[in-house]
Amino acid sequence: MRFMLDTNLCICAMKHRPAELLAQLRAHEAAGLGISSITAAEWHSGMAKSRSARNEAALLQFLEPLELADFDAAAAAAYGRLRTALELAGTPIGPWDTLIAAQALALNVTLVSANLREFARVPGLKLVSWVSAGE
């Protein structure tokens, strides 16, 4: 995996289907696209709340070609360092975003997100957005 897709980017892809994002996903597919197991957990929680078989089928279809990165010991150690650094700097980010960013750091992959403002606070994180502001 070279690119880890954040939860909000996946939501944007499924709900709004912006042409530029879909083109980027196709263009980078061979390079290796994946998601964190944290993102998968967020998705499955949302699907359980929606109670929609159609939504669940769409989610599973979207996730099928993506590599799923398990949150392992290296990610846990990166999380501990990152959370401490952000708290000491007075610039914490949300708990799920901290977990996802830490895993991206541990895997040395680029995080693809529509939430650049939040993730820009993470030192050393490779970060891009494949959507225009307002998507």
Question: Where are the language model's segments positioned?
Answer:
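Active-site neighborhoods of divalent-metal-dependent phosphate/nucleic-acid chemistry enzymes
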Residues: 57, 67-114
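Short, well-structured N-terminal submotif of metal-dependent ribonuclease cores
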Residues: 1-35, 45-63, 88-89, 133-135
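A short acidic, often aromatic-flanked loop/helix-cap motif at beta-alpha or helix-coil junctions
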Residues: 41, 74-77, 133-135
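Generic structural signal for small/hydrophobic residues in well-ordered secondary structure
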Residues: 6-7, 21, 43, 79, ...
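Acidic, PIN/NYN-like endoribonuclease modules and their adjacent C-terminal/linker elements
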Residues: 1, 26, 101, 105-135
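Alpha-helix capping/helix-boundary segments
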Residues: 9-10, 39, 75, 100, ...
